[in-house]
């Protein structure tokens, strides 16, 4: 697996801070949330169907030359939450001023929206990379206890991390210490559409999912054991 592509309105500590300082409740577009939930379900079903087609056509051979049949996924029993991944891209630019030329360091945060399916019964996590409007999807990532070396959730940072499993113990340890061989993502209780791109479009999926997020956190803690 690979890393998918700043936190805002997340649960946990930030929710406690809001209640402590008595922040006013937001006005939410309930119809849009309902519509986005329906679109999440539809796009998840389509992604699973496409994944199963690709898996059935793929031939996998282990190190001993034995052919392995990839397991197909049934969409039944999956619960869904909206999430996202961030990548920080740094670049240097030369800037002219009255005092000469100097180097300016610029950091751009790139967001990747995710529909995250999880199944309590099978212990499987399916991550589908989508656009903010939930009109299309691209990459699909499937995780089970068998193909994960380690999973963890940072309470303070609120980042969910899944590390790839290797057949070598040494490689597993190196993967755990590496930033490259892991999948990281976040699941916020609230994503209110306040983050906008330069064209005015929504950056994150508009969603309020307090109870759903709490259920996913409980699932992930069990998944990580």
Feature-to-residue mapping (PLM):
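N-terminal functional modules and adjacent low-complexity/disordered segments of proteins
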Residues: 1, 8, 12-16, 73, ...
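Anionic N-terminal interaction surfaces
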Residues: 2-140
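Phosphoinositide-binding peripheral membrane targeting modules
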Residues: 83-84, 88-186, 192-225
């Amino acid at each position: 697996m690979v890393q998918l592509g700043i936190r805002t309105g997340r649960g946990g500590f930030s929710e406690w801070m809001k209640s402590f300082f008595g922040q006013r409740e937001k006005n939410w577009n309930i119809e849009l949330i309902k519509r986005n939930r329906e679109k999440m379900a539809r796009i998840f079903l389509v992604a699973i169907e496409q994944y199963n087609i690709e898996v059935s056509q793929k031939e996998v051979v282990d190190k001993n030359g034995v052919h392995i049949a990839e397991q197909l996924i049934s969409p039944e029993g999956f619960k869904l939450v909206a999430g996202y991944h961030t990548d920080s891209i740094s670049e240097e630019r030369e800037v002219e001023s009255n005092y000469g030329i100097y180097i300016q360091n610029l950091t751009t945060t790139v967001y990747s929206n995710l529909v995250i399916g999880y199944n309590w019964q099978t212990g499987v996590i399916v991550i589908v990379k989508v656009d903010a409007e939930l009109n299309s999807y691209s990459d699909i990532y499937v995780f089970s206890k068998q193909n994960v070396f380690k999973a963890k959730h940072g309470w303070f940072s609120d980042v969910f991390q899944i590390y790839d499993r290797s057949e070598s113990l040494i490689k597993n340890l190196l993967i755990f210490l590496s930033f490259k061989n892991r999948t990281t993502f976040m699941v916020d209780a609230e994503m209110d559409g306040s983050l906008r791109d330069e064209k005015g479009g929504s950056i994150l999926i508009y969603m309020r999912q307090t109870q759903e997020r709490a259920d996913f956190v409980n699932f992930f803690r069990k998944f990580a054991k």
